[in-house]
């Protein structure tokens, strides 16, 4: 693993129309199939057209998965006691739902964006910032085009702009 926990890496997806009324059933069957991995060494979350708070967390909880990242905790922190692992998972359970109250980290405090809404976009921005920190240069006065306008891309654009990046365009699946 280049930058993350030494537990391997994978990406999974479902090729399915998110507007199809059978979406909930498809997701529930998929989570049931991967639940053993979600408990031991794999993590999942919200992504394209799948909401972490309203779909992923409740659907995986119905299967006895404590948190969609439970497997990452169990896989990465092998030396943790059961109590320490449970404490880490409990922090995930409460942490992702917390509203961001510091105006430096949210476009609008009154909209009550949560950690789950903003964290991946923040990570994208931090990755870009870290690149310039390692290789020289600055983000200030750079230009960027953002692909999509979901949680990740919108939050990434917000944090990139905070670092002085000028967002000059947004592209979505329709162009």
List PLM regions with ranges.
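Glycine/serine-rich phosphate-binding loop and adjoining beta1-alpha1 elements at the start
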Residues: 1-139
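Aromatic pocket-lining residues of Rossmann-like dinucleotide-binding sites
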Residues: 160
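Hydrophobic Val/Ile/Leu positions in short beta-strands of Rossmann-like dinucleotide-binding domains
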Residues: 144-146
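N-terminal Rossmann-fold NAD(P) dinucleotide-binding loop
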Residues: 153-154
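Glycine-rich Rossmann-fold phosphate-binding loop(s) that bind the pyrophosphate
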Residues: 148-150
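NAD(P)-binding Rossmann-fold cofactor-contacting core
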Residues: 163-175
């Amino acid at each position: 693993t280049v930058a993350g926990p030494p537990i391997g890496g994978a990406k999974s997806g479902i090729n399915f129309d998110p507007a199809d009324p059978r979406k909930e059933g498809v997701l529930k069957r998929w989570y049931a199939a991967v639940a053993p991995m979600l408990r031991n060494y794999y993590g999942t979350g919200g992504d394209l057209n799948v909401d972490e708070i309203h779909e992923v967390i409740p659907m995986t909880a119905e299967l006895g998965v404590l948190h969609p990242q439970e497997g990452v905790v169990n896989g990465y922190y092998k030396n943790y006691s059961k109590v320490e692992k449970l404490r880490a998972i409990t922090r995930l359970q409460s942490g992702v739902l917390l509203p961001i109250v510091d105006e430096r980290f949210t476009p609008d405090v009154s909209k009550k964006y949560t950690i789950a809404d903003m964290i991946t976009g923040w990570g994208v921005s931090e990755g870009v910032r870290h690149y310039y920190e390692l290789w020289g240069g600055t983000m200030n006065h750079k230009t960027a085009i953002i692909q999509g306008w979901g949680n990740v891309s919108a939050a990434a654009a917000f944090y990139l702009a905070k670092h002085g990046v000028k967002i000059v365009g947004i592209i979505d699946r329709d162009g």
